[in-house]
Amino acid sequence: RVNTLRLWSAKATNSFDLRVFNSGDYEEAVRAQTFAENISKVLYPEDSTPQGKELRLQQQYFFVAASLKDFIRHTMPKGFDVRELPERIIFQLNDTHPVIAVPEMMRILVDEYDLEWDEAWGITKQCFAYTCHTLLPEALEVWPVSLLERLLPRHMEIIYRINEDFLAELRETYPGDELRVRRMSIIADHPERSVRMAHLATVASVKVNGVAALHSELLKDKVLNDFSELWPERFTNVTNGVTPRRFIRQSNPELTKLITDTIGKGWVANLDRLEELTAYADDPEFRERFRAVKAANKVRISEVLEQRNGIVLPKDHLLDVMVKRLHEYKRQSLKLLHIVTLYDRLISGEVDPASLTPRTVVFGAKAAPGYHMAKETIFLINRVASVVNNDPRVAGKLFVAFPPNYNVTLAEKIIPAADLSEQISLAGKEASGTGNMKFALNGALTIGTDDGANVEIRELVGDDNFFLFGMTEPEVAELQARGYHPGEFYEGNPSLKRAIDLIASGHFTEGNRDAVSAVIGDLLYNDRFLALADYASYLEAQERVEA
């Protein structure tokens, strides 16, 4: 057996109470069943309400408890000694969502196997490794103490004890430095008493890693700086990756055949061998076959989108693709400003249409249920697409598609067809990214910032195959420290001002200015992720793409 995937669903132990039903209380008769099924009905339930937060914590604990118990009871041989666990298993904590596993493991060892606290803790902290997948503070889970005390009182007791012992260790290591002790405490006192799950994971793990070289450095220098100073040997980097079996061999069989015909078999299991293709970069036959593969993949995605969504893509366009979850730091808004600028320049006559490469921009994204600004951005992209695609003045030069319900199945069709991969997050905010890897693996060029795994991709593919733009992470920090005023960039760049004014005028929303006020207001008066600051550099990079 190579690996085991466990899929859990919650079921009530008593799903139907006939006595209560017969008394006429029909809802109460199935309450236990409904409550249990809700736990696993929707992965990551929306948590902007107290009820949503409670359900999400219940779900996290349910998955964690089921997985730990399954491993200990069914995977380990009968009669094994739990003291051997560190020699047999490492539980990987992927982000903060499963970190409740730490007190659950302690509960199992202390309450079910009757180990002494110190022995149980010694075992537990050798059984976990923590991967942090973010640099956004809001993405590092923090659970109210009051909620944990109500739902998982025993686990909260255990967390208190872990924190008590940890703080004692800190005071011994840093005598008199109470400010540091408060910063590092697993339990925060402000703005409300809460458990910092990233701190708990770091304290309990034998290794802590980021998911790209830059991300791991920022993790040590900023997000978990105090911890990296205390335990420098605990921190490492493991850059994210993608499986070539799915994202080239399965999704792009034509390119797979071309590569195999060129350098032989075995490269799927050893991607370093792709470097052998360098010798064929100027080979006319190889280049012609590569162009034919890309053209065939464009035909395939055109057929899929027409059948799936009624979207008819123009032929012979540069396929410019931005597919990823919708978040402000990923800056779909910056891509939208580029589209509006191209549109404005075409309809105003500022540029000769013949001088522009025909371009189709494809978006794919979903927003978290409670993420208002992300939903506003999706709305605006679709409105811009509707106007652009029906304006005869830009026909044959610019087209925008936003197929709904982007998923892995659709990704396997879009990615092989892409000419240009948009990886334009604000420098210092993208932990790694994996879409950037999938596009590069399928022969797309990248336009992107010096962020996440972009840094390592650019080192491998070379500057000629990567259109770099934007501020570096230190430059971002410097601008924010000086005080960022997006209005200054708006007033100082005529193209940017025209693009924003065109959106704000209601041009894309049938004259309804209120429909775009949230997005425009945020760009002009907040712009947390500096889209306006990077706009000029981004347009210059897009002009290099055209060249």
Where are these regions (language model features)?
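A conserved ligand/cofactor-binding region detector
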Residues: 1-547
